[in-house]
C-alpha cells in the first residue's frame, strides 16, 4: 500500500493579486521542523539552531533614536529639539537655534583657551626666604700678572717671546734667572706656568673665616686663562664645605694680599697675555661650577679695602616649550655637572683642538698643549673669534636650576697715614710698597637669607580643563558625565549596526548551507497547488489533478 501525503495551502481574500510566488517565498520565512518520528514539530526563524531553540521570539532591539537618547541625557536643551512622536514645530526650531548658538559660543571659548595654552606663557615669581645657616661659596682669585719676572730665564724668553711680545733683538731690561734644570726634556708650557706663577704663600698676608684663622693650605690651585689661580672653599681638596651661621661683615672671608707689583713683567709688546692692570681678579661661584674668571670675575685694586656683600640667588627656569633651559645632563668628557661655564670651557676646548690641534694650559683633556707660536698664531685668535663673533658654535643654554651670587661692592682707602708706618714695619716693606701692593678683601653674606627667582607656568593643563569645564557648564549645562553619555550612546549605535550586519551575513550563510526554507504564511501565500486543472490525460509519472511543478512544489504536494 502506497501512502501519499499532500500539504494544501489556502489563500485568503486579502492576499495581493499578482504577487510573485518566488518573492513571497524569499521575503519572510520560518523553517518547518520535523521530528525524527515523522510528525510535525515547532517553527523557528531561519539561522537558528534547532537543538538550541529557547523561545518563539528574538531579543528585542534597543531603541537608538535621538529623541529617546536626548530625552534622558543631561545635555541641556537637546530634549526640546529632539522630541519623540512629534512633528518639528516653531518651538523646536527656536530651541534648536538657541542650542546651536550655545554650542558655538562654547566652542569659541574652547578654541580661545586652547590657543592661549599653546602660547606657553610663564610668570616670574620673586621671593626671599630665611635660613638657619648657609653654605659659603667658592672664592677664586687670580693675580693680573701671570708670570713673575724673577723666575724668567733667557731660554724662557726665547720660547715665550711670541706670547710675551719679546723679540730677540730686545734687551730684557730685567735680571734673568738661572736656567732651570729640565733634565734633557723639551720646553713645557705647563712646567713654565707652574714655575713662574705667583705663590699663595707669598701673596697671602692674613686670612680669616668667621673669626678663625686660615692659611695658604686652604686655597686650591687651579688653571684659568690668567694662569695659575687659587680657590678657597672649593670642596675638592678633601675639606668639608664651610658653613656660615650669621650675616654681616666679620662672618665671612677676610684676607690681606700682597699683589707683588715688583714681580710684574715689563711690557715688551701688546699681546693677549700682556696686562696693564695691577691687582687681582675675583669670582664668587658655587662649588659645582668651574671658574670662568676672565669673563665673569670682578677686579680688586691695591691700596683699598674692598667690601663685597653677597646674596645667594636660587634660580629656577622652565624647560621647553615654556622656556629654553637645559634639563638634560651634560654630555662632556670633562665635567659631571652642567653649568654655563662648564659648557663654555668644554666647547672652547673642542673648538681649539679641532682648529689648532692643541689646547691651552687651562683647558681640560689630554690633547697636547699649544706652543707659544700656536698660542699667538692660532689659539688666541681662534678663541677671540669664538667669543666675539661666532655665536652659533658655542650655544650654552641656561640650566633649569642654578645658583648665583648678587654682589654689592664698596671701598675704603688703605693704608691710612697713621697705619702706613706700622704695616711697613710689620711686613718689612716701605710705606710706598705698602700703598702700591697691599689690599684687603672682605666677602660676606648681607643677611642669612636667600632669594628665589622662579619661572612658573602661567597656564597649566589643569587650568585649561577647568576653564573648558566651566564654559561647558555655562553654555550647555554639560559635564564630563555628559560626554560619557554621548560616548555610551555612540557605542550602542555602532554595536547595534555591527551586530545587525553580522546577523544578516550569518543568515545568508545558513541559507546557502541548509537550502530553501518556508514559513507558514509563505506556504499559504505561495499556494503551489492552486494551479490544479482538469486533466484529460496524465503521464505515467504524474498524480491525478497535479500539473507539473518544481522540485520543492512536488515535494509539498
Curated annotation (Swiss-Prot):
It is a multi-pass membrane protein. The keyword Cell membrane applies. Residues 46-57 have a biased composition (Acidic residues). It is found in: Cell membrane; Postsynaptic cell membrane; Cell projection, Dendrite. Gene3D superfamilies: Acid-sensing ion channels like domains (2.60.470.10), YojJ-like (1.10.287.770). Keywords: Cell membrane, Cell projection, Disulfide bond, Glycoprotein, Ion channel, Ion transport, Membrane, Postsynaptic cell membrane, Sodium, Sodium channel, Sodium transport, Synapse, Transmembrane, Transmembrane helix, Transport. Inhibited by the diuretic drug amiloride. One of its GO terms (cellular component) is postsynaptic membrane. Residues 1-98, 492-557 are cytoplasmic. Residues 116-460 are extracellular. The record marks 128 as: Involved in channel desensitization. Glycans are attached at residues 133, 194, 401, 428. The record marks 390 as: Involved in proton-dependent gating. One of its GO terms (molecular function) is ligand-gated sodium channel activity. The chain crosses the membrane at residues 99-115, 461-491. A motif (GAS motif) lies at residues 477-479. The second transmembrane domain (TM2) is a discontinuous alpha-helix disrupted by the GAS motif, which forms the selectivity filter by adopting an extended, belt-like conformation aligned approximately parallel to the membrane plane. This peptide belt encircles the waist of the channel and divides TM2 into two discontinuous helical segments. The distal helical segment of TM2 interacts with the cytoplasmic portion of the first transmembrane domain (TM1) from a neighboring subunit, contributing to the structural and functional integrity of the channel. Forms voltage-independent, pH-gated trimeric sodium channels that act as postsynaptic excitatory receptors in the nervous system, playing a crucial role in regulating synaptic plasticity, learning, and memory. Upon extracellular pH drop this channel elicits transient, fast activating, and completely desensitizing inward currents. Displays high selectivity for sodium ions but can also permit the permeation of other cations. Belongs to the amiloride-sensitive sodium channel (TC 1.A.6) family. ASIC1 subfamily. Homotrimer. Heterotrimer; with other ASIC proteins producing channel with different properties. This is Acid-sensing ion channel 1B. It comes from Danio rerio. The gene is asic1b.
Amino acid at each position: 500500500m502506497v501512502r501519499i501525503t499532500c500539504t494544501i495551502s489556502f489563500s485568503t481574500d486579502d492576499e495581493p493579486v499578482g504577487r510573485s510566488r518566488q518573492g513571497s517565498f524569499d521575503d519572510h520565512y520560518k523553517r518547518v521542523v520535523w521530528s525524527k518520528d515523522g510528525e510535525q514539530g515547532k517553527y523557528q526563524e531561519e539561522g537558528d539552531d534547532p537543538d538550541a531553540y529557547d523561545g518563539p521570539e528574538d531579543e528585542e532591539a534597543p531603541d537608538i533614536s535621538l529623541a529617546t537618547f536626548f530625552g534622558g541625557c543631561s545635555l541641556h536643551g537637546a530634549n526640546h529639539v529632539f522630541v519623540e512622536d512629534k512633528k518639528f514645530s516653531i518651538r523646536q526650531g527656536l530651541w534648536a537655534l538657541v542650542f546651536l548658538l550655545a554650542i558655538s559660543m562654547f566652542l569659541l571659548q574652547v578654541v580661545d583657551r586652547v590657543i592661549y595654552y599653546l602660547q606657553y606663557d610663564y610668570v616670574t615669581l620673586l621671593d626671599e626666604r630665611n635660613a638657619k645657616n648657609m653654605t659659603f661659596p667658592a672664592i677664586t682669585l687670580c693675580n693680573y700678572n701671570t708670570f713673575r719676572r724673577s723666575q724668567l730665564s733667557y731660554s724662557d724668553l726665547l720660547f715665550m717671546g711670541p706670547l710675551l711680545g719679546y723679540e730677540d733683538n730686545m734687551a730684557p731690561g730685567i735680571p734673568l734667572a738661572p736656567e732651570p734644570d729640565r733634565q734633557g726634556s723639551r720646553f713645557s708650557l705647563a712646567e713654565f706656568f707652574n714655575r713662574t706663577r705667583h705663590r699663595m704663600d707669598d701673596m697671602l698676608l692674613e686670612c680669616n673665616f668667621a673669626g678663625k684663622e686660615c692659611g695658604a693650605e686652604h686655597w686650591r690651585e687651579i688653571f684659568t686663562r690668567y694662569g695659575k689661580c687659587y680657590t678657597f672653599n672649593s670642596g675638592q681638596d678633601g675639606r668639608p664645605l664651610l658653613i656660615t651661621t650669621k650675616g654681616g661683615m666679620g662672618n665671612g672671608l677676610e684676607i690681606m694680599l700682597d699683589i707683588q707689583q715688583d714681580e710684574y713683567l715689563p711690557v715688551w709688546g701688546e699681546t693677549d697675555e700682556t696686562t696693564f692692570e695691577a691687582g687681582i681678579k675675583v669670582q664668587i661661584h658655587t662649588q659645582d661650577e668651574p671658574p670662568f674668571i676672565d669673563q665673569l670675575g670682578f677686579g680688586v685694586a691695591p691700596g683699598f679695602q674692598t667690601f663685597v656683600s653677597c646674596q645667594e640667588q636660587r634660580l629656577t627656569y622652565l624647560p621647553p616649550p615654556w622656556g629654553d633651559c637645559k634639563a638634560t645632563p651634560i654630555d662632556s668628557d670633562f665635567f659631571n655637572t652642567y653649568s654655563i661655564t662648564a659648557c663654555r670651557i668644554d666647547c672652547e676646548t673642542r673648538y681649539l683642538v679641532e682648529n689648532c690641534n692643541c689646547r691651552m694650559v687651562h683647558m681640560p683633556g689630554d690633547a697636547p698643549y699649544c706652543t707659544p707660536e700656536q698660542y699667538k698664531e692660532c689659539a688666541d685668535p681662534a678663541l677671540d673669534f669664538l667669543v666675539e663673533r661666532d655665536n652659533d658654535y658655542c650655544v650654552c643654554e641656561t640650566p633649569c636650576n642654578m645658583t648665583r651670587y648678587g654682589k654689592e661692592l664698596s671701598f675704603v682707602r688703605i693704608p691710612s697715614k697713621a697705619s702706613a708706618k706700622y704695616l711697613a714695619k710689620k711686613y718689612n716693606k716701605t710705606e710706598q710698597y705698602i700703598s702700591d701692593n697691599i689690599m684687603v678683601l672682605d666677602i660676606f653674606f648681607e643677611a642669612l637669607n636667600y632669594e628665589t627667582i622662579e619661572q612658573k607656568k602661567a597656564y597649566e593643563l589643569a587650568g585649561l580643563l577647568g576653564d573648558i569645564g566651566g564654559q561647558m557648564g555655562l553654555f550647555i549645562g554639560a559635564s564630563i558625565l555628559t560626554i560619557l553619555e554621548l560616548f555610551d550612546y555612540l557605542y550602542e549605535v555602532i554595536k547595534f549596526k555591527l551586530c545587525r550586519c553580522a546577523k544578516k551575513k550569518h543568515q545568508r550563510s545558513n541559507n546557502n548551507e541548509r537550502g530553501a526554507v518556508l514559513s507558514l504564511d509563505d506556504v499559504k501565500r505561495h499556494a503551489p497547488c492552486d494551479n490544479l486543472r482538469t486533466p484529460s490525460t496524465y503521464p505515467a509519472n504524474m498524480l491525478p489533478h497535479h500539473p507539473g511543478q518544481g522540485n520543492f512544489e512536488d515535494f509539498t504536494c
